[in-house]
């Protein structure tokens, strides 16, 4: 049986977070009434000329610096010619032969797949280019009986199209790359990353070939995937479709396909064009884009500390694992919150802080559907909870209860943990005499478990610990209970 290799390349459109459009002064606000944010340039009225938005260029430079690419000292804009109702000029202003960002790399963390028995691993994805272009308008098919409405609010919105080499070999790798790219553009402040509003969307080029074959198979492009789940589902379906088609004696056709999330399948949209079909030529209305070293240095000076550098610093400074550091730097807000907690709780509590952020904190955020920057528990409040675990005042179980109380109360006092501990009498029982008395009662009431433990059943010991913790309503120091039980059971 033929073994197949999957080949995936992604083209990602990141909408740049400028106040105005790339070639006009019209606003870029999302959700306005149709055609209220389109000026004569966007409408392609006769006699108007495009003027390049400097802010869009600076955001492209920032991205290029972050991925270690070459910033072209001279790049040009081209007209990409095609007809579509929401493209009033009859062409899109883009970059073709000389893009502003050339090359670069993004390192991704691919999670383990326990079902397939595959461990987690790291991979570097090479980028071909990233170029500036304008977005098209939007066709509206609802509310127009038998007709299509055109909304040109989006026309002219600045995009950075980011293109990878065809180096990804599974949907899992493609999703890991898309998530890493999404986190990076949001981190850099060049894109808000709102996938529901179309600020970040992917086109996936998918093909298959027999393992060991160098020649690429015929690719299909799946357009406008605006969620990581859809990206994964669409690629997996397309891979199955192509393999089944070839094994049944058919041929894969080069085409553009759309993903139907309701049916969880891709369907043909149109035949896929090649570059020559668009008849690219330099836009005569725009001067070449010249970027001097002084401009690059000014942008570099304003760059934030990058996720990769912070990850390494977290590993070196706080002793967290590389994987944990990756999770903690999944967003700038998460990294800042972690460092704020550690600053209050002390570096000695960095690992427990990391575990809490990836565990209880993330769980509560998901439950409430909010991001870390909207968390109702301040870094100082969480730090105090962790300090009380460290100094033995409370157990980890009680700490979870206190954290949940602070969260639900939306408490504002920095000393909320101590207040709740005192009000509810939650201090951990660490007095040896008191614990011994409780353990004696537990042993007397659970003679069967004692016999089973002495007969070699380790599970019985855990049952006794559970009974002791139950007797103290979770307030006993678990480590002391463990030691005292072992001592008494000989």
UniProtKB/Swiss-Prot annotation:
Keywords: ATP-binding, Ligase, Nucleotide-binding, Protein biosynthesis
EC number(s) from the headed UniProt entry: 6.3.5.-
Reactions catalysed according to its record: L-glutamyl-tRNA(Gln) + L-glutamine + ATP + H2O = L-glutaminyl-tRNA(Gln) + L-glutamate + ADP + phosphate + H(+); L-aspartyl-tRNA(Asn) + L-glutamine + ATP + H2O = L-asparaginyl-tRNA(Asn) + L-glutamate + ADP + phosphate + 2 H(+)
Domain of life: Bacteria
GO molecular function, one term: glutaminyl-tRNA synthase (glutamine-hydrolyzing) activity
Broad enzyme group: ligase
Single GO biological process annotation from the record: glutaminyl-tRNAGln biosynthesis via transamidation
Keyword Iron-sulfur: no
Alphabetical list of SUPFAM superfamilies matching this protein: GatB/YqeY motif, Glutamine synthetase/guanido kinase
Family matches, as InterPro entries: Asn/Gln-tRNA_amidoTrfase_suB/E (IPR017959), Asn/Gln-tRNA_Trfase_suB/E_cat (IPR006075), Asn/Gln_amidotransferase (IPR018027), Asn/Gln_tRNA_amidoTrase-B-like (IPR003789), GatB (IPR004413), GatB_C_1 (IPR042114), GatB_Yqey_C_2 (IPR023168), Gln-tRNA_amidoTrfase_suB_CS (IPR017958)
Family named by the database record: Belongs to the GatB/GatE family. GatB subfamily.
PANTHER family linked to this entry: GLUTAMYL-TRNA GLN AMIDOTRANSFERASE SUBUNIT B MITOCHONDRIAL AND PROKARYOTIC PET112-RELATED (PTHR11659), GLUTAMYL-TRNA(GLN) AMIDOTRANSFERASE SUBUNIT B, MITOCHONDRIAL (PTHR11659:SF0)
Protein name: Aspartyl/glutamyl-tRNA(Asn/Gln) amidotransferase subunit B
Species lineage: Bacteria, Pseudomonadati, Pseudomonadota, Betaproteobacteria, Burkholderiales
Gene label: gatB
